[in-house]
C-alpha cells in the first residue's frame, strides 16, 4: 500500500481515502505485482492438488473400493484477467468464487453444517461471481468467549472430529446460515449436490 500511495502522488491521482490507492496498469510496479501474485495463485493450486492426492492415498487404506468421479478446483480470494461488458478488466474476488455458466464450484458451510456443490449461472451483474461460503458472523475471539466445549459437542453431534477447545472458534454458531446464503444466491448459482458432514479434519 505504501508503494501504491506513492504512485498516486507521482501520478497526481486524488482519492477520497489513501487506502484506495492502487498500482496503475502499465507501470513496472503493477507488472511486478501481477507476476508474483499469479505465481502465488499457481503455488496455491498445486498445494490443493497435492493435498487431494495425499487424501486419496490415505482413503485407500480405509475404503476398499471407491471411484473418483470429478475433481473441482474452486479457489477464492484471487485476481484474474476477464472480459466483462466488452472490456478486458482485472477481477478480484474476495470471499467469492467464479460462477460463469456451468463453472463448477463448492460453497461450504461450517465444520458442522452442510456444503453445496454448485454450477454457475453466469450472472453478468455479479461479474460471474458467487459467495464462496457461509462466512463468519463473529470473530474468533468472540466465539471463544461466547461458546463452550459443551456447545461444540452439541453442535457436532453425529460428526467425527477432534474434540479440543482449540476448535471452539470454529463452532457452527460462529458462522452465517449457509442455507440462507444459498437461497440468497439463487440468481447466481444452481445447486447440484448437497453434502452432509460425517468427518471433520481441522489442524491447530
Residue ranges of predicted features:
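Domain-length cofactor-binding catalytic modules of enzymes
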Residues: 1-204
